[in-house]
Curated annotation (Swiss-Prot):
Name the UniProt record assigns to this protein: Elongation factor Tu
Family per similarity comment: Belongs to the TRAFAC class translation factor GTPase superfamily. Classic translation factor GTPase family. EF-Tu/EF-1A subfamily.
GO biological process: translational elongation
Enzyme class, first EC level, given as a word: hydrolase
GN (gene name): tuf
Stretch list, region G5: 176-178
Superkingdom of origin organism: Bacteria
Binding partners and assembly: Monomer.
Localization per record: Cytoplasm
Lineage of producing organism: Bacteria, Pseudomonadati, Planctomycetota, Planctomycetia, Pirellulales
Stretches assigned to the tr-type G domain: 10-208
Function: GTP hydrolase that promotes the GTP-dependent binding of aminoacyl-tRNA to the A-site of ribosomes during protein biosynthesis.
Length: 398
């Protein structure tokens, strides 16, 4: 367990890198760490450290899977940064990752321009509620034509506007991550990263934390620590959890379990409490490793209940957005992805005979397992591992 106390001196913001595979997301993350480390504001990490989390090789490259968490500071803020996987097959991680962002750095290779996954990630960002995007045009050193850069920038701005981001006002930083990663102390090489940090500080407002609401954390991972007990990790969605407080484990079964949180840690440092927006591990008294799983939530007792039936407003992705090619009808049985897990359920259309790709419809859903939910919670609709729609719970039925 952690030893150092976590110091809270600067406001805390969650960001992450999104964008097409091989456009340089992980290198950009490494460059930020290297440049900030040279200023004493971060610990540098190598590319392979950031890309770890199970790397699967395709024919030529190492495709980054899983979500890497790193931390660094700017002059004004403390950032927790996730390096989101860019590969279409790993959209599931993208969903768990993107749900954790106050803002995202959209990395686009200036040599290639926006690609299918660039679009997919912006769309996903819009769906899972990433409120702000800052654009980083990478590999500008490979493009010697100023007009081409202008063109790529225009293309990215149009793409953002299409998905309801303020495309005309979004900061676009031009740079090259590899030289900055290799020479972090060289002012010329690192200038683009300095500009990127300034853009993050100025364009992503300090998030209004939901500290005053009742505590809720979606469980992402569970592990046992010898002699200490069971730890559940995740991002605190709302509220505050203090060491010694009672919490409830809810979801994926009819019964909820009450337990006491006997320790909170963040980035291997012990804390007296965890607040909304923090990625923490909670040590739980008397809970066995097998009694708790990803997809459940930890919450203030009595503040949220598990449900299986609800009404929702659903958007079915169009074929061009990577959605279904055919309509669905009442009795449709996809997976519903809530917070950190997929649950199978049945959707029945309300006031419509069918839902075409690209349509918005009202549905009644019955899940096979109960999920902790309240009105306004968002979910993705998935088939065989790909996202075909997104929705928001409008009314809980039972």
């Amino acid at each position: 367990m952690a030893k150092d106390k976590f110091e809270r001196t600067k406001p805390h913001v969650n960001v992450g890198t999104i964008g097409h595979i091989d456009h340089g997301k992980t290198t950009t993350t490494g460059a930020i760490l290297a440049v900030q480390a040279a200023k004493g504001l971060a610990k540098a990490k190598g590319y392979s450290d950031i890309a770890k989390g199970g790397t699967v090789r395709d024919a030529t490259k190492t495709v980054t899977i899983a979500v890497a968490h790193v931390e660094y500071e700017s002059e004004n803020r403390h950032y927790a940064h996730i390096d989101c996987p860019g590969h279409a097959d790993f959209v599931k991680n993208m969903i768990t990752g993107a749900a954790q962002m106050d803002g995202a750095i959209l990395v686009v290779s200036a040599a290639d321009g926006p690609m299918p996954q660039t679009k997919e990630h912006v769309l996903l960002g819009r769906q899972v509620g990433v409120p702000y995007i800052v654009v980083y045009l990478n590999k500008c050193d490979l493009v010697d034509d100023e007009e081409l850069l202008e063109l790529v920038e225009l293309e990215v701005r149009e793409l953002l506007s299409k998905y309801d981001y303020p495309g005309d006002d979004v900061p676009v930083v031009r740079g090259s991550s590899l030289p900055a990663y290799n020479n972090p102390s060289d002012p010329e090489a690192s200038k683009c990263i300095t500009e990127l940090m300034e853009a993050l500080d100025s364009h992503i407002p300090e998030p209004t934390r939901e500290d005053d609401k009742p505590f809720l954390m979606a469980i992402e991972d569970v592990f046992s620590i010898e002699g200490r007990g069971t730890v559940a990790t995740g991002r605190i969605e709302r509220g505050v959890v203090k060491v010694g407080e009672e919490v409830e484990i809810i979801g994926l079964g009819p019964n909820s379990t009450k337990t006491t949180c006997t320790g909170v840690e963040m980035f291997r440092k012990e804390m007296n409490e965890g607040r909304s927006g923090d990625n923490v591990g909670c040590l739980l008294r008397g809970v066995k490793r097998e009694d708790i799983q990803r997809g459940q939530v930890l919450a203030k007792p009595g503040s949220i209940t598990p449900h299986t039936k609800f009404e929702a407003e659903v958007y079915c992705l169009s074929k061009d957005e990577g959605g279904r090619h055919t309509p669905f009808f009442s009795g449709y049985r996809p997976q519903f992805y809530f917070r950190t897990t997929d649950v199978t359920g049945t959707a029945n259309l309300v006031g419509a005979d069918m839902c075409m790709p690209g349509d918005n419809v009202k549905v009644e859903v019955e899940l096979h397992k109960p999920i902790a939910m309240d009105d306004g919670v968002r979910f993705a609709i998935r088939e065989g591992g790909r996202t075909v729609g997104s929705g928001v719970v409008t009314k809980i039925l039972e």
